[in-house]
Amino acid sequence: MKYKKVIGNTPSGGDYSEIYYFDSNLNNVDEKVASKCIIREFKSDGTLVQETFGFCNKDNKLL
């Protein structure tokens, strides 16, 4: 599965996040062509803290 791992503090108190990118049919795609994303925030031990669904525009910014 394609995703981007971002190391650093997250808004919900996590230590890192993973961003998974999807097209309009929820197929996992490269971030450059994504229209939707799921952002998962984790503690350093892998415990899931928060999961957020978002819509991305052509510049991959949350709408």
Regions found by a protein language model. Give the residues of each.
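Glycine/tyrosine- and acidic-biased, solvent-exposed loop/turn segments at the edges of beta-strands
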Residues: M1-L63
